[in-house]
Amino acid sequence: LIVQDYIRAAREELDVSVGPGRGSAAGSAVAYCLGITQIDPIKYDLLFERFLNPDRISLPDIDVDFDDDGRGRVLNWVTQKYGADNVAHIITYGTMATKLAIKDVARVQKLPLSISNNLCKLIPDKLPEGPDGKVPKMNLNNAIAAIPELREAETSSDPLLRDTIRYAKMLEGNVRNTGVHACGFIICRDNISDWVPVSTAKDKETNEELHCTQYEGRVIEETGLIKMDFLGLKTLSIIKEALENIRMSLGIELNIDEISIEDPATYQLYCDGRTIGTFQFESTGMQKYLRELQPSTFEDLIAMNALYRPGPMQYIPSFIARKHGDEPITYDLPCMEKYLKDTYGITVYQEQVMLLSREIANFTRGESDALRKAMGKKLIEKLNHMYPKFIDGGKANGYDPKVLEKIWNDWRAFASYAFNKSHATCYSWVAYQTAYLKANYPSQYMAGVMSRSLADITTVAKLMDECKSMGISTLGPDINESYLKFSVNHSGDIRFGMGAIKGVGEGAVQQILAEREKNGPYKSVYDLVERVNLSTCNKKSIESLALAGAFDSFGTITREQFVTPGSNGETFLDALVRYGNLYQTDQAENTFSLFGATEAIETTQPEPPKNIERWSDLERLNKERDLIGIYISGHPLDSYRIIIEKVCNMHMDQLEDITPFANQDVMIGGIVTDLRIGQTKTGKPYGIVKMEDYSGAGELALFGDD
């Protein structure tokens, strides 16, 4: 009821988006009826005993996703409702890993940095297998046993080096610092300090002082307190952004929780593999499998979401072949069809193992969950204990012991890969919502995705390419069409947000938007400086807007005219801002005539410089990129596009993995953006060339005569 209360408050009072559920709580019909989750557990065979059963010792927890922006507001609401002394975040303890222990000790010992770095480079990410075939745990003792150079350092005649290794071994694994758990939160009926020791910690984002328990999460449960998880999910923010774009551009109030789960356009998008920008399904490999699978039901999407991960991925080709009838669907026992039909005879979910253990061997609900846990965590002793019960139960139901043994061994092999269906179903529904929006409201959705990706301009560039392939133009910022973030204009094209321009702060954009909303579009740059507060929207902001092309739609003054000095050495931009300040001062200090009428003193509008040298396309594009981080109105390679597409067999974004091009001659075309020249240790020259093409940027190393 506590969880239901803050979820209700999030939706009804705080305008915060809430996810449909996650984890085992989605198997609870009570949680569904209370509105905590939005996935019908009966319809999708989600099991309550994963959430709660008599054999479960620990208290169940309900993890809830909120949109990124709203999570903090929900936590504040909870704090106000229950009292600041009754709630607390959870502390985390950061321990010294192997490399960090060496570095910290080396710094105190004043061991030269080069030697410290060399020691750290000797530490592998993973130790080799031991004589028993097992991979030893990574720690300094095991690393020393496996690596001769570290053994030499441990017994070195240099006391500094020897002591560094000795003290690092002693300090490894000790607590080095504290932090705050990313999502864990405690709500207590009493003052929380009556139950556990409390400290304070600074919130890295808001700089607020937070109450924190001094016990870690795993210890908290032993005190009897319940941990609640408040998670921030970026995808919910994207969906919220898209819904706002739909409302603003089309006037439609769409309820995303009530969309059809059988929308043809959405399934066509999945069948075409056009999932860039959607949740969970956008990787290149997933796109390939979707095109092969041709999903036609929501169950297909749940299964693909569960299968596309290391381990079960090997079953995807068989899953696809069985769906299309290219491989026979077989069941070890006829009764297994009931629970494996939706996944074409392949065990995909942990819940299937639980249901089948009951069906075949009469396991109780609690026992089936214990089996799921034992298989997932490879608890050999527990499995050995449950094996006779499974065989005996199956024999009692008339099944062949050899077939039962095969089923058991198959489960043991696959159970560590099997996925939680409750979680896969919830997240597949969120993924479906994003695909629905992309299929039915493409401009509005892609604008939302780009707004939430501004910190990664490479991702924005890829999303712009995706928009182009969808027939959607991504236009540069415009003073009369742009908002703070990406938006959709009346033609259905996406406009860059003014907040994406370097040098234009959020305060300046809000000032521009508030004035535009109040008194209509700006008619010219003169009209702009006459109306906006020039303390907030200052010269730097106006310059950045001009050079980014936000005033191009006025058509009277070019970008270079703003910043090229005139005959008196002053730029038009300087004169324009001075004019705006004078105009606003005159308006404020208007004089009264004899009859009391208000008359503003006329201020002369400055003229932009004439006959100045126009910027080349490359110069204009480079300034655009400096301010926005990306080429918008064109690309320096546009004149060579046909040649590049005809001649080149490799793109810059493929440099990350050149395995497919082994033993091949490759041709790359692009623009050189940086060049570093140096000498190797042997005195030979080398160069590092940074190049960029339409796909992205990369570096090429050239040596000797290259």
Stretches with model-predicted labels:
Residues L1-A575, Y579-N581, T585-Q587, L594-A597, ...:
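Alpha-helical scaffold/interaction cores of sigma-54-like transcription cofactors
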Residues L210, Y215-E216, A461-D465, T556-D706:
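Prokaryote-biased recognition of long, low-complexity C-terminal linker/tail segments
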